Curated annotation (Swiss-Prot):
InterPro entries: adnlytase_SelO, SelO. Belongs to the SELO family. The active site is at 246 (proton acceptor). One of its GO terms (molecular function) is ATP binding. ATP binds at residues 84, 86-87, 107, 119-120, 170, 177, 256. This is Protein nucleotidyltransferase YdiU. Nucleotidyltransferase involved in the post-translational modification of proteins. It can catalyze the addition of adenosine monophosphate (AMP) or uridine monophosphate (UMP) to a protein, resulting in modifications known as AMPylation and UMPylation. It is an enzyme of class 2 (transferase). Its EC number is 2.7.7.-, 2.7.7.108. The keyword Transcription regulation does not apply. Its cofactor is Mg(2+); Mn(2+). Mg(2+) binds at residues 247, 256.
């Protein structure tokens, strides 16, 4: 089957990119590809059998027209000016049979005009982390970019140490970022901001295109998508680590996996990025940061959208966030109805978990085994203060009884939303260290495991992290 690529970005937004081709690596070789995703995109298996090829930037497929996008942004709350694709190249936009499109973005593809002081490269460590994280999030049901392939090489890349150069093929319906809009707003080119908005509406909100109120309705949905995404992050214990405006997806996708981390111990102020000295991007601050980022996006739209309409949309953020968060947390607790004491029960559990440094994922998974008429629970052994747990657990079971739902029905719901497996940093690190020695077995094994996060397992993928794996510091270097 021949793949079809179109050039909407190149043709409709000429001021937003520089056309250029990838720079191949030395002795590049394909070490992993996403068979399930490739099948979904109707990619012939033969493309994965002819060396690095398109996956290593050595060839282009018919119809591809590679380019690097320019955008700007606020980083750690400070205006950073022009940024752009410093090491990534949009190879093309694949047109799928259902009329939707998928960007093919090659990360680590070499120098671009937007590389600033960088070398345009990515290292094996970061490409493995992003591939694992994006696929883990996808199978958790959280909107995200996807990983299609990884190529490693003999090209040395200099970070804190010398590491192997690598490339990741990332795919997504769109790579539109808040930072695209900021770029032209701060260049005082509001007509180009409007062009970006029109492009987004035409191709991703086409049902609004003929509505006279299209910009307001569109921004309302951007706010809602962002609020929903953040609610989902918070419920699975995901910390992004670097929520700069240039890393915010207009479509509400999880974008740009850098120093991310899933909670091990329940620690609301968890900071996964060792460069985040002030804790701006701590786990519990993510909802506030996302709103701040939406305010920056709203500012760029103010030349052609009424300020009252923008503020009304921003004011809806908290309610949308809390609604989605509340729904998901009630599911995690097994509540089939909404009762006034639910928030108090959840907050008391969180307080107990924080005091005891309980494992976030394991706590909710073990809670899924609760029998409403039995005081016995494997979760009890996870707490030092047994009396405090017993008191909370008794009230929790009384709340479950109010719903008049069988244990089996409720347990099935809870086990479908409380994962047994999340991508803990130590699991990723173990796969990385093996891959850097040439052994890809653990990379493939972990990828396969992450496809079934809600299934019980008997291996160490679902265990507490070992001592060396707790609070691994992760940097932005990639």
């Amino acid at each position: 089957m021949t793949l079809s690529f179109i050039t909407r970005w190149r043709d409709e937004l000429p001021a937003t990119y520089t056309a250029l081709s990838p720079t191949p690596l030395n002795n590049a070789r394909l070490i992993w590809h996403n068979t399930e995703l490739a099948n979904t995109l109707s990619i012939p298996s033969s493309l994965f059998k002819n060396g690095a090829g398109v996956w290593g930037g050595e060839t282009l497929l018919p119809g591809m027209s590679p380019l690097a996008q320019v955008y700007s942004g606020h980083q750690f709350g400070v205006w950073a000016g022009q940024l752009g694709d410093g090491r990534g190249i949009l190879l093309g936009e694949q047109l799928l049979a259902d009329g939707t499109t998928m960007d093919w973005h090659l990360k680590g593809a070499g120098l671009t005009p937007y590389s600033r002081m960088g070398d345009g490269r990515a290292v094996l460590r970061s490409t493995i982390r992003e591939s694992l994280a994006s696929e883990a999030m996808h199978y958790l049901g959280i909107p995200t970019t996807r990983a299609l392939s990884i190529v490693t090489s003999d090209s040395p890349v200099y970070r804190e140490t010398v590491e192997p150069g690598a490339m990741l093929m990332r795919v997504a319906p769109s790579h539109l970022r808040f930072g695209h809009f900021e770029h032209f707003y701060y260049r005082r080119e509001p007509e180009k901001v409007r062009q970006l908005a029109d492009f987004a509406i035409r191709h991703y909100w086409s049902h609004l295109e003929d509505d006279e109120d299209k910009y307001r309705l569109w921004f309302n949905d951007v706010v809602a998508r962002t609020a929903s995404l953040i609610a989902q992050w918070q419920t699975v214990g995901f910390a992004h680590g670097v929520m700069n405006t240039d890393n915010m997806s207009l479509l509400g996708l999880t974008l740009d996996y850098g120093p991310f981390g899933f909670l091990d111990d329940y620690e609301p102020g968890f900071i996964c990025n060792h460069s985040d000295h002030q804790g701006r991007y701590s786990f519990d601050n993510q909802p506030a940061v996302a709103l701040w980022n939406l305010q920056r996006l709203a500012q760029t739209l103010s030349p052609f959208v009424a300020v009252d309409a923008l503020n009304e949309a921003l004011d809806s953020y908290q309610q949308v966030l809390l609604t989605h968060y509340g729904q998901r947390m009630r599911q995690k607790l097994g509540f089939m109805t909404e009762q006034k004491e639910d928030n108090a029960l959840l907050n008391e559990l969180f307080s107990l978990m924080a005091r005891e440094r309980s494992d976030y994922t394991r706590t909710f998974r073990m809670l899924s085994l609760t029998e409403q008429h039995s005081a016995a629970s494997p979760l009890r052994d996870e707490f030092i203060d047994r009396a405090a747990f017993d008191d909370w657990f008794a009230r929790y079971r009384r709340r479950l009884q109010q719903d008049e739902v069988s244990d089996i029905e409720r347990q099935q719901l809870m086990q479908s939303v409380n994962p047994a497996l999340v991508l803990r940093n130590w699991l990723a690190q173990r796969a990385i260290e093996a891959a850097e020695k040439g052994d890809m077995t653990e990379l493939h094994r972990l990828h396969e495991a992450l496809r079934n996060p809600f299934s019980d397992r008997a291996d160490d993928y679902v265990s507490r992290p070992p001592d060396w794996g707790k609070r691994l510091e992760v940097s932005c270097s990639s």
